[in-house]
Amino acid sequence: MKLKSLIPLFLFILLRHCIGADYYVDSLNGSDKNDGLTIRTPWKSHLKAESVSLAPGDVVHFKKGSAFSGSIWISESGTAAKPIRLTSYGKGELPKFTNPTTSDASGNAIILGGDYLIVENLHFHDTPGEHVSGMIIMTRLAALRIEHGSDHCIVRNNEFIKTGQGIMSAGEHTLITQNYLDGPSYALWRTSKSSWGPMGIHLNIGNQEVSYNTIKNFGTKDSPWGSDGGAIEIDCGKYHKKNIYIHHNYSEGNAGFIESSWDYDWPRYRQEIYNWRVSFNVCYDGQSWLFMLAPCTGIYFDNNTIARYNGFGRSQNACARIDVRGGKPVGKPSGAHFRNNLFIYSSSPYTGNRSSDALKTANWYSKYKSPNTKYMGDSNQAGSGDPALVDLEKQDYNLKADSPLRGKAINLSELYKLDFYGRPLPKTGNWDIGAIQYNTTKPTKALQPKR
C-alpha cells in the first residue's frame, strides 16, 4: 500500500521534470494558502515566485489586472531547451510591478539571478530615482535588473512606465526586445555639481542585443550638465564591452540615444569598446544622438535615421558627439565607422575632438529648414540637401518616390537582412539611405510596440 501511494507522487515529479510546472499568481482573488498550481488555486503574493524552487521549464503566470509592490529575486536557472518563464495570463491590463523604495533591493521590482530566464508581458512602473542619494546604488537601480553572471536571459514584450531606469543588464548573451519604455524626467541621483540618468536601458557588459524596442522621454532638462539621461547607456567599466548589437529600435524625446562612458563610471574604470553594430534605428531625440567617450575598435553605425532638430527643451543638439578619451584614434580602420545614415540636424552632424577623423561612408546630410546647405565633407558621402521624406514634421520618415536617398547607400547584405519595418533588404545592388527603404506598400503592423 505504501508503495502504491508513492507511485502518483513519483509520476508527478517525473512529469514536472519532463515538461515543467505552471504556477499562477492573482493579487485580487488568490490566496497564499493555495498550491498555486492551477488557475482556480492561484497564490496572492508575487513573493511566492521567489520562495518556490523553480526548475527548468517552469512558468510563473501573473494574472492580468493584478498589482504587486516590492522586489522578487529569481535565483534558479533554466536551460536552453527549457527556460524558466515569468509571464501573464487572463484578460485586461498587464500585471503591474513596482518597488517604491531603494531600501528594498535598491528599488528593483524583479531581479534575475539565474541563467536562461524569460520575462515577458509584464508592466513595470514608478520605480525610484528622484530622491536617491549616493553613487554606489546607481549601479543597481532599475525596475528589472539582470545580475552579473546571469546569462542567456530574454526580456520581451514588457512595458516600463516612469521607471528611473527601465532595464539594467549585467548578464551576457541577453536579448532585450519589443519592450515599450516611457521614462520620467527626474534624475537617478543629483548633487549641486552633477546628476545621472534617467535611462531606458542600461548595459553593464558586452555580448548583448537590444532590438525592436520603443524608448521615449528618458531625460532631465535641469541637471548641472544642462540635461542628462537617454535611451540606452553602456557603462560600468568593471566588465568588458565587446559584441553589442543595437538595432531596429525607435526612440523619441530622450536626452540622446546612446552614450558610452569613459572614466565617469563608479568605480572609475576606463573601458574600451569592441565590435558593436548600431543599425536600422529611427531616432527623434534631443541632446546628442550619440555621445561616445570610450575608445572604439570595430564600431559600426549603419543605416540609421537620425532626426535631431527638436531639442525637447535641451541645449546640446549635435547628431554624433565623439569626445573619445585615450585609446586608439577614431579615424583609424580600428575605430568608429558611419555608413548609410540619414542625418537631419539643426546645428551639426558631428562634433567632438575626434569627429573630423571618424570614418564616414555614403551618409546623407540635411540641415533642418536649410535644404541648400551642403555638407563640406569628403567625396565618400552620398550627398546633402532635402531628403524628400513623406512628412518630416509628423515623423513619417518613409521615402517619397523621388527621394534622392534611393540607391545611394552601399550594400551591406552580408551583415543585415531586414529594414526598420522588417522588409527584406536587396541582396545585390545599392540600398537606400537610412533605416527605412523605399516601398510602395506600407507595413501592416509596426515591429516596435506602441501604447
Model feature map: region roles:
Residues 99-111, 132-147, 161-165, 189-205, ...:
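Extracellular beta-strand/beta-solenoid scaffold signature
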Residues 379-440:
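C-terminal accessory segments
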Residues 61-63, 77-137, 383-387:
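Right-handed parallel beta-helix/beta-spiral solenoid domain characteristic of secreted/periplasmic
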Residues 55, 63, 76, 81, ...:
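Parallel beta-helix/beta-solenoid
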